[in-house]
A protein has these predicted regions:
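Hydrophobic alpha-helical segments and their boundary regions
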Residues: 16-17, 142
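Short N-terminal helix/helix-N-cap motif within the alpha/beta-hydrolase-1
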Residues: 15-16, 130
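Ribokinase/PfkB-type carbohydrate-kinase core domain
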Residues: 1-5, 62-64, 93-193
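Short polar catalytic/cofactor-binding loops
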Residues: 8-13
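Substrate-binding N-lobe of the ribokinase-like
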Residues: 3-4, 17-84, 88-93, 100-105, ...
């Protein structure tokens, strides 16, 4: 049976409208796609990380409720899970502030086996973060070796536009790995100016 394996960030998004919090929901670029696939009944596995706190429990429970296998989610017992504050304007466009508390050694999990029938999803800043690059490449190399479909969701935010030149070799390497690339006009504008 075909499986979708995603690697990426999980975060609790707290949305603000008129400077008032309105809702808190788990999110993340790859995460959101996996939730939709899990709800549709697809066989979904997620490789990610959360803190061993109440927010981490909320995120893990949300994943399980939406059909996502969490066996490859690293839980850091003495850390806080990441959160983002999303301030929505009158057009519902968001301006983000991120708060993270990761250890220096990250994502110390065994990667799931990948078969030729699988689809591997990766993306966002998580896919180009130097501290995680070896783990991301480990999964991508497995996927490439067996002929799995590799889907790259660029999701390159304006907050990282000033780093685009420094990150470009990794971004281009991700393009080379990918069979399918998804990105918005804004993503590519942030990367290439």
């Amino acid at each position: 049976m075909r499986r979708v394996i995603g690697i990426g960030e999980t975060i609790l998004d707290i949305l603000f409208k008129n400077n008032q919090p309105t809702v808190a929901v788990p999110g993340g670029s790859v995460f959101n796609g996996l939730v939709s696939l899990g709800r549709a009944g697809a066989n979904v596995t997620f490789i990610s990380e959360v803190g061993g706190d109440h927010v981490g429990e909320i995120i893990l429970n949300f994943m399980k409720e939406n059909g996502i296998n969490t066996d490859s989610v690293m839980v850091y017992p003495d850390r806080k899970s990441p959160i983002s504050l999303a301030f929505l304007n009158e057009k519902n466009d968001a301006e983000y502030s991120f708060y993270k508390d990761y250890p220096s050694l990250r994502l110390d999990v065994d990667m799931p086996e990948v078969t030729s029938d699988d689809i591997v999803m990766f993306g966002s800043f998580y896919a180009i973060t130097p501290q995680l690059r070896d783990k991301v490449k480990e999964l991508l190399d497995k996927a490439r070796k067996v002929g799995a479909i590799i889907y790259y969701d660029v999701n390159f935010r304006s907050t990282h536009a000033h780093e685009a030149i420094k990150l470009m070799p990794t971004i281009l390497e991700n393009f080379e790995y990918a069979d399918i690339v998804r990105g918005s006009t804004e993503d590519f504008g942030n990367m290439f100016g």
